[in-house]
């Protein structure tokens, strides 16, 4: 028996022994650590409504609308106690904390008070919620990557929960929780875990690996479909049509490379029960988490891996399901035929309309965001719950990705329930444009970064809401700002929202050529903090300051700059220690003398250096220092490449 089969049997056996299969769990009213862990391991229950519950969030966001979302600590607590400790979370009634996030953990203790008690039930260092040093706060539920520190370990509470930090100052944080009706029976979280709770945590990674690779566990009614098709431009093809009640458990499309590139010409359309509004209508690339035309996302529920696309969201329907691919003609030029394969698993298990919603998505491309208004992920009237977001974000103003300062905001049934502290924060990250923080693409089971490029001023992220799915009874609004204040940074946003509901929240727009073309800026910028360097000789690097001893060489990689012809500019500084340098491309001299000397300190923006050609072979520039013991420094704030 291989490792995969052994893991699958262990997970199934554990759930069987615990007696918490989906059919039984739906009938039990008690909320416990075990029941919440089961929501994270058995995702076949994701379509089930969470009626009567509300998900809210306490965060350090600036309530004045400005951008002090944790820097000063002014908004980073509910109240200060007489001993200067900080109440950072307080909720009445019954509930469960589903998510704790911060980019600024500290080593001070957090005290957890249950049910109005004057004595903490347990205390833990804030940093140990994420360090993987303290069980049960371990991977995959708790950890840190991409600049963010996250914990999804459920913390159920009855008759209220208060969390107090012994730190004198807190900075950025978010604590998300679900409140239950008063009559709900809840077992308080305890650090003394029962054997079955320990087992559930330890086997969770295995169950997630199985789900991502193989989809939800098949039942006796599972059937399989396979389709091969050669799709010509201008054609559409029905990949699957099921004319009886059931639910789709997994879909795989291949090759993933067929959906790459610019523009994104292939759309996917999924329709339930002949509804007028498609449940899914989006570019295939956007739906599966590509980043600006290239495969990127490998989440638990959908993504691209091994040149295949996978979709694991359970998708129940009442009478009929239809899945189509549409290959749009290009406005100019020839497109090749695409050979596509599809594998689908589904069962005849009927949807219970009283207890389950249908799966829907909403694709929203804003080629230019509206000043003063946020970008909407999803909005409308229905009953259901929100389960995921994908966002590609492209700045329209060259330079730093300041549009990603925008906060998320959620309104449920007419009331604001959540307000975030920044865009990478929403995706469980932190500190964009910082080395080894939010600076590259990375996929984790529940969240990740699709891309990060300072030269292109673009990024993107995704986040799944599983045990913390956001329920709504009548209406839902979920959006994100673009810019630190008043949505004041122009950007190009493309998003996918995923939710279950009794009907679509709102109709989307059909993806056409104009809305699926990827924006490519004509001005690109390199910043020192993420430049890639090579040096020859003795050169010290400190931020934007480069100091040479003798005739040092500083070579800067241009691999992030696309091939083409550019005018090269620089934002630089000069002063009395400024060196004289020459500029080279490989062995070709581009400019014999560039001076960083000036009698007093002066900042100079957009200084023209040289015309420059970048190719696959010529993708570096080198500054060669001219020896001078008194003038050994250059200061580069950024390099600017303007297409000719």
Locate the predicted segments by residue.
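A generic structural signal for short, solvent-exposed coil/turn residues
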Residues: 18, 23, 92, 104, ...
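Intrinsic-disorder-associated interaction segments
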Residues: 4-7, 30-36, 197, 561, ...
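Extracytoplasmic
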Residues: 407-412, 417-423, 507-644
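Short acidic/polar micro-motifs centered on Gly/Asp/Asn
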Residues: 4, 271-273, 627
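Bacterial Sec-dependent N-terminal signal peptides
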Residues: 1-28
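Short, functionally important structural connectors and interaction interfaces within domains
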Residues: 12, 462-464, 626
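Beta-strand-centric surfaces of beta-sandwich/beta-rich domains
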Residues: 27-525
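Residue-level detector of intrinsically disordered/flexible regions characterized by low predicted structural confidence
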Residues: 4, 10, 68-69, 76, ...
């Amino acid at each position: 028996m291989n490792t995969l089969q052994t893991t699958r049997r262990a997970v199934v056996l554990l759930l069987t022994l615990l007696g918490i299969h989906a059919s039984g769990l739906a009938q039990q009213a008690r909320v416990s650590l075990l029941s919440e862990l089961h929501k994270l391991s058995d995702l076949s229950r994701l379509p089930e409504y969470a009626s009567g519950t509300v998900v809210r969030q306490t965060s350090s966001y600036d309530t004045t609308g400005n951008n002090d979302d944790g820097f000063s600590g002014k908004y980073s607590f509910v109240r200060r106690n007489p001993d200067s400790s900080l109440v950072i979370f307080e909720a009445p009634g019954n509930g469960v904390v589903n998510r704790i996030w911060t980019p600024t953990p500290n080593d001070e203790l957090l005290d957890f008070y249950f049910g109005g008690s004057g004595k903490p039930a347990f205390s833990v260092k804030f940093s140990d919620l994420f360090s993987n040093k303290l069980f049960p706060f371990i991977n995959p539920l708790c950890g840190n990557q991409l600049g963010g520190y996250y914990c999804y370990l459920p913390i159920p509470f009855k008759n209220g929960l208060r969390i107090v930090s012994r730190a004198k100052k807190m900075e950025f944080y978010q604590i998300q929780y679900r409140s239950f009706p008063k009559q709900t029976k809840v077992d308080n979280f305890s650090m003394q875990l029962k054997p079955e709770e320990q087992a559930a945590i330890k086997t969770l990674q295995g169950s997630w690996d199985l789900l991502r690779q193989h989809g939800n566990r098949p039942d006796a009614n599972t059937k399989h479909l396979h389709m091969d098709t050669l799709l010509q431009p201008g054609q559409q093809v029905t990949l699957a049509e099921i004319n009886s009640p059931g639910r789709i458990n997994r879909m795989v499309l291949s090759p993933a490379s067929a959906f790459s590139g610019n523009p994104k010409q292939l759309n996917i359309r999924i329709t339930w029960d002949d509804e007028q509004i498609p449940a899914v209508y989006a570019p295939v690339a956007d739906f599966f988490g590509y980043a600006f035309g290239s495969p990127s996302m490998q989440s638990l529920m959908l993504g691209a891996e091994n040149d295949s696309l996978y979709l694991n969201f359970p998708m129940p329907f009442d009478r009929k399901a239809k899945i189509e691919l549409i290959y749009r003609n290009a406005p100019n030029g020839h497109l090749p035929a695409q050979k596509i394969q599809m594998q689908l698993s589904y069962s005849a298990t009927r949807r219970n309309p009283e207890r389950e919603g249908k799966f829907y998505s909403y694709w929203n491309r804003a080629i230019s965001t509206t000043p003063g208004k946020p970008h909407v992920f999803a909005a409308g009237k229905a009953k259901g719950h929100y389960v995921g977001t994908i966002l590609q974000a492209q700045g329209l103003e060259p330079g730093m990705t300041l549009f990603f300062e925008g906060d998320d905001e959620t309104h449920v049934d007419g009331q604001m329930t959540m307000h975030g502290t920044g865009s990478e924060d929403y995706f469980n990250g932190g500190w964009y444009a910082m080395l080894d923080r939010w600076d590259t693409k990375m996929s984790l089971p529940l969240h990740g970064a699709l891309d990060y490029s300072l030269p292109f001023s673009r990024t993107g992220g995704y986040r799944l809401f599983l045990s913390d799915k956001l329920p709504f009874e009548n209406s839902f609004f979920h959006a994100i700002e673009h810019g630190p204040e008043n949505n004041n940074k122009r950007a190009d946003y493309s998003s996918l929202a995923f939710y279950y509901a009794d009907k679509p929240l709102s109709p989307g727009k059909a993806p056409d050529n104009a809305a699926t073309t990827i924006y490519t800026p004509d001005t690109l910028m390199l910043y020192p903090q993420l430049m890639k360097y090579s040096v020859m000789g003795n050169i010290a690097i400190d931020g934007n300051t480069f100091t040479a001893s003798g005739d040092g060489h500083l070579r800067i990689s241009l691999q992030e700059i696309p091939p083409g012809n550019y005018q090269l500019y620089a934002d630089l500084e000069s002063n009395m220690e400024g060196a004289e340098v020459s500029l080279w491309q490989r062995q070709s001299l581009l400019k014999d003398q560039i001076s960083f000397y000036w009698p007093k300190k002066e900042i100079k923006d957009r200084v023209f250096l040289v015309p420059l050609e970048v190719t696959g072979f010529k993708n570096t520039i080198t500054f060669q220092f001219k020896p001078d013991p008194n003038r050994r420094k250059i200061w580069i704030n950024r390099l600017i490449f303007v297409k000719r």
